[in-house]
């Protein structure tokens, strides 16, 4: 049985970009200052206040967004006053996003605006340096994921100092409005988190028009707003983290209820031996949906999410293909108890949904071998949870705490050295030195 915990990894990240895992992270936009993209934790959905609203009436998250919008440099051939108003309206649309993650970059510092003020384009950059020190043989890789904690500990790797610029990246944002599409946004993001944390990797590429989103985007099954902020890039291990090519419809009714559903191109992770069993190509789209109730202008919400998928394998003993239905269910919430205090919670369970989770996506757990019958695979059960809180000491200094666990339930107890469950605990402290420059540390 493998029990994974972390007590001794301290990440300090110095970044021109953002923070992840115990790190001091500085973020920067390629446009001039280091552009930090850390948008505090989970209440971004709510903050559509206008630029005219008094600052003292805004929450700390809304103040951050307003400050970033006010600092945006607009390049236009039209009237400069109108341009500032137009860019504010368009950028509010950028930040009010159900699927926006804490570590996503902020809008580009420089924005080109059309003469009529209905179209804006910006190209931004993000410099993010993460560093860590491990003094008790916790984990042999950059970042932190309990799945990779070695059991037993490796005596040759009991102390480790590391740093990476893998979060550094580029992004392009197109924002606009017209009579046919309504409000629309195109977004492309890539960074150097690919092979060996050096190769360039596409992170997102999607187009949103009105209630529709098409492209490579965050899965509808993931609630990015219900997660505490972490410097660690992986985040709490008991949550979901998945990006798919998808077609999604999302609509909000009377500012209180939101429903969404999507067809997502599948990518299953099946553990087979190639002798008695073999995974088959995916051919049925994953289906994800949620219903959400929100209040406080969207700063708080409760959400129920569901996932259904078809997992196919071949029994090489009898020479026949089989389909197994995989599913997942999730309850998630963000609650703004006070203007400066947020609470987060997520509980996820299911069978055959493991590749959507943070920890179990590190290996092949959607289907595994049946220990009682050769040639058979089955979808094991897994349960995970995330609890968190965030507190703003000032409008620029805030802290997050997170507690999370992922449990894996195969038909038989795993043997020694095999994953059974992982525990995750983290404390993060962030300081927004400017609207586009941030440092942080995590334990």
Which residue stretches match the model-derived regions?
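Extracytoplasmic loops and strand-loop junctions of Gram-negative outer membrane beta-barrel proteins
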Residues: 105-109, 150-157, 228-232, 272-274, ...
